[in-house]
C-alpha cells in the first residue's frame, strides 16, 4: 500500500513537470510573437502600401486599344466586354466601348499580361466597395481614371508622380508658382478642345 502511494506521488510529479514543460513551450511561442512587429493595421485610418506587383483595379487606355479581344479570350470567365465597329475606309476595327465588371473579376491579371498594346495595367487601388453591385461595372471612362495614391503620407511618393514633374525637378514642393508640369491633366484636355 505504501508503494502504491509513492507510485501515485511519483506519477503526479512527472505529470506536473510535463505540464509545466508544455506551458513553458506555449509561453515561449507567445513571447516570440510579442517581440514581432504587428501585422494588422487600423484599416480606415492606416493603409498598407501595396507591393510593386500588386494586382488591384485595372486601368484601361482607350487610345492604345486595337479591339483585338485578346483580353476576352484569355480571361477565365470571358469578362471584358469589347464593342467595336469595322471601319471600311481604313480597314481597321474602331473601339466603341470597353467595360469590366469588378463584381465578377477575379483579378488574375491575364488580360494585362497578354494585351499586345499594353493598354491594360494593374493599379494599386483596392477599395472597390459599393452599395449596388451594378456600380462595379466600370466602363472605359471609369477604367481610364488613375487613382491618386493609396496612402496620404507625404513621405511616400509613388514613382508615377515623379513622371509629371518638369525635367530636373525631383521634389514637387520646390516648384515655382505657375510652372507647367509635364503631361496634361484631364481638365486641360477639355479646355483645349
Swiss-Prot record:
Give the region (Disordered) as residue ranges.
174-193
Query: According to its record, how does it sit in the membrane?
Result: Peripheral membrane protein
Swiss-Prot/TrEMBL catalytic activity: a plastoquinone + NADH + (n+1) H(+)(in) = a plastoquinol + NAD(+) + n H(+)(out); a plastoquinone + NADPH + (n+1) H(+)(in) = a plastoquinol + NADP(+) + n H(+)(out)
Q: How is the cofactor bound?
A: Binds 2 [4Fe-4S] clusters per subunit.
- For whether the record's keyword set contains NADP, the answer is yes
Cofactor(s) recorded for this entry are: [4Fe-4S] cluster
- Record carries keyword GTP-binding: no
This protein's UniProt keywords: 4Fe-4S, Iron, Iron-sulfur, Membrane, Metal-binding, NAD, NADP, Plastoquinone, Quinone, Repeat, Thylakoid, Translocase
- Give the SUPFAM superfamilies listed for this entry: 4Fe-4S ferredoxins
Main localisation? membrane
Instruction: Give me the stretches of Basic and acidic residues compositional bias.
Output: 184-193
Q: Which InterPro entries match?
A: 4Fe4S_Fe-S-bd, 4Fe4S_Fe_S_CS, NADH_quinone_OxRdtase_chainI, NDHI
Give GO BP annotations, semicolon-separated.
photosynthesis, light reaction
* The enzyme's E.C. designation: 7.1.1.-
A GO CC annotation recorded here is:
plasma membrane-derived thylakoid membrane
**Subunit description:** NDH-1 is composed of at least 11 different subunits.
Functional summary from the UniProt entry: NDH-1 shuttles electrons from an unknown electron donor, via FMN and iron-sulfur (Fe-S) centers, to quinones in the respiratory and/or the photosynthetic chain. The immediate electron acceptor for the enzyme in this species is believed to be plastoquinone. Couples the redox reaction to proton translocation, and thus conserves the redox energy in a proton gradient.
Q: Identify its protein family.
A: Belongs to the complex I 23 kDa subunit family.
Protein name (record): NAD(P)H-quinone oxidoreductase subunit I
* Organism placement in taxonomy: Bacteria, Bacillati, Cyanobacteriota, Cyanophyceae, Synechococcales
